[in-house]
A protein has these predicted regions:
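Extracytoplasmic beta-strand/coil segments of soluble accessory domains associated
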Residues: 24-27, 50-81
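Surface-exposed extracellular loop regions of Gram-negative outer-membrane beta-barrel proteins
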Residues: 121-134, 173-175, 182-186, 262-269, 309-313, 322, 336, 340-386, ...
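Outer-membrane beta-barrel "beta-signal"
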Residues: 333, 390, 517-529
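Flexible loop and strand-edge segments within Gram-negative outer membrane beta-barrel domains
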Residues: 168-245, 270-272, 281, 353, ...
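Transmembrane beta-strands of outer-membrane beta-barrel pores
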Residues: 135-140, 154, 165-169, 193-199, ...
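Short acidic/polar hinge/loop motifs at secondary-structure boundaries
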Residues: 78-104
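N-terminal periplasmic accessory domains that precede
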Residues: 49-52, 86, 111-134, 146
Length: 529
């Protein structure tokens, strides 16, 4: 009898926990980013990261190799290197704790201009030690592409590795190593190393980077200190660069649990040498950033600012030219959460864009000649002001997100972006779709995407991604194809093996207007141990 009673209590606790998880929102809007929690969704177990990313309203798919648009892919805030397609198409949603879609993190992450970050926080597979996976790409004009992805975990250590190789009129090799050490409940160390080697007939280049991130939690309230140190070296036939960097950041409640503060300092020292002329220049960036969030039961108010101090020095012929300047990234945002299903956001963001250092130090024209005219010997900024209105409705099987942003760009064309996405899950079928609309005086363009997935008997999974571009869409003008398509077939074999095939850029094979024939088959294999 006592044993049956304990079983009943355990079942009730599990039921309450499940109901609590189902009541939590799948999507959470924050001041500078949107959080997606795959574990709160109803998953079959075989959904990929790419399937979840279809929920992102501003996702712009330009092709199988241009899925993330302007997003920089990171894992635990460490930039990924090389071929990221395997990560997108093969990483399981059940292995992801949360996805941070950072579209306005100029204060928190120091992104410049329209730069965005897609940060993946992984979790170890349940009852498994890890997984290993690989892929190979076979096409008419794209040949010799392969990647390997692996995750291994123990009680105190997780190790993630990604390596990719590409042979197409040259060789490209990429390696990423990512290790997390949990010393105890309050101390954690994350180390990161990446290397790339590119050997093309025109030039050979290489880059290595190492970074360490140490986290210490002081108390039960969540006061946390982050310390970061890193170094990067890059070299090509024209330039060589050395870049040491540091970050110190404190996140803590302030005075009460309702008010939280993020305070940080960040700096790097870029040393560049032009090999042919032996000219050199140094750029020292030093940032101070502060952000406050005040939370009420249904309201969240966030204000923040990052001040960036630039000091740059050009050395040539014994003469030293020095310049200094200051930049500001600012945000102010209010989020209204009437219940656990609906969220509404109104935000203002001030960003800036700098001309390339090459324009100033090498007297060289970039893709935009106006950059040199704008610089006139100084790195003068262009201000970008964004006003954003967003709404999200989310639960386990249905999520709808809409975003509207107006951008006022200094000395450039102002424009408006309207984005919407929807996700719906029913028995044996998942439907995801969205649209992106760009409006400016010079013209209007749009894209429409639809991504259904069917779950068949014997664990077969068939998915399709279709994106249509209007005539003035930059993607259509670049590739000539009005439609992008990718057909995916996946089949698990037992509990450990999964085999998949992606036929990507498939309409390039049939469209006479295609400027590049990119269609190919990508074969993927995963083993979980």
């Amino acid at each position: 009898m006592p044993r049956q009673f304990l079983i009943l209590i355990s079942f009730l606790l599990l039921s309450v926990s499940t109901l609590a998880d189902s009541s939590l929102p799948v999507v959470e809007i924050k001041a500078d980013r949107t959080m997606i929690y795959p574990q709160r969704m109803e998953l079959t177990g075989e959904e990929s990261l790419m399937d979840i990313l279809q929920m992102v309203p501003e996702l712009l798919i330009g092709g199988y190799e241009d899925v993330l648009s302007s997003y920089n892919l990171r894992i635990d805030n460490c930039p990924m290197n090389g071929d990221t397609r395997l990560i997108l198409s093969q990483m399981k949603a059940k292995d992801i704790a949360k996805i941070q879609v950072c579209d306005n993190t100029g204060v928190a992450k120091g992104t410049i201009g329209m730069g965005r970050v897609l940060d993946i926080n992984m979790k170890m597979p349940e009852r498994l030690t890890g997984f290993a996976e690989g892929q190979g790409d076979f096409g008419k004009e794209v040949v010799g592409i392969g990647s390997v992805n692996a995750l291994y975990g123990s009680q105190h250590t997780d190790l993630y590795a990604n390596a990719s190789y590409r042979h197409q009129n040259g060789n490209e090799e990429y390696l990423t190593l990512h290790m997390t050490n949990r010393f105890d409940d309050r101390n954690r160390l994350l180390t990161y190393f990446t290397q790339q080697y590119i050997d093309h007939p025109a030039a050979v280049s290489r880059k290595v980077m190492g970074r360490a991130r140490y986290f210490h939690t002081f108390n039960e309230l969540g006061t946390e200190l982050l310390l970061v140190g890193g170094y990067q070296y890059a070299s090509d036939p024209v330039l060589s660069n050395k870049l040491p960097l540091f970050i110190a950041e404190l996140n803590t409640p302030l005075f009460s649990e309702r008010l939280s503060m993020m305070l940080g300092v960040e700096g790097d020292f870029l040393m560049t040498r032009e090999k042919d002329t032996d000219r050199s220049w140094n750029v020292f960036n030093n940032d101070i950033y502060l952000q406050f969030t005040y939370s009420l039961p249904k309201w969240k108010l966030t204000v923040g600012n990052r001040v960036m101090f630039y000091n740059y020095n050009l050395k040539e012929g014994g003469i030293s030219q020095k310049h200094s300047d200051t930049r500001n990234n600012t945000n102010a945002c209010i989020v209204y959460v009437p219940d656990n299903r609906n969220q509404l956001q109104l935000g203002y963001y001030r960003k800036y864009y700098n001309p390339s250092y090459l324009v100033l130090f090498m007297d060289a024209s970039t893709l935009y000649d106006e950059e040199w005219m704008k610089a006139e010997g100084l790195l003068e900024e262009w201000d970008i002001h964004q006003v954003k209105l967003a709404y999200a409705y989310s639960k386990q099987k249905l999520t709808v997100q809409t975003e509207a942003s107006y951008y006022a760009v200094e000395d450039e064309e102002n424009f408006t972006e309207l984005d919407v996405s929807a996700y719906w899950k029913t028995k044996g079928l998942t439907l995801t779709g969205g649209s992106n609309l760009y409006i400016a005086r010079s013209g209007t363009s749009a894209s429409l995407r639809f991504a259904p997935t069917v779950y068949l008997p014997c664990d077969w999974q068939i998915g399709m991604q279709v994106v249509y571009y209007t005539k003035k869409s930059p993607t259509r003008e670049l590739y000539g194809t009005p439609v992008y398509g990718c057909l995916s077939v996946n089949k698990p074999f037992g509990k450990r093996w999964t085999l998949g095939v992606d036929w990507h850029d498939m309409f390039d094979a049939f469209c006479s207007d295609a400027l590049v024939n990119r269609h190919a088959a990508n074969v993927k294999l995963q083993y979980r141990f």
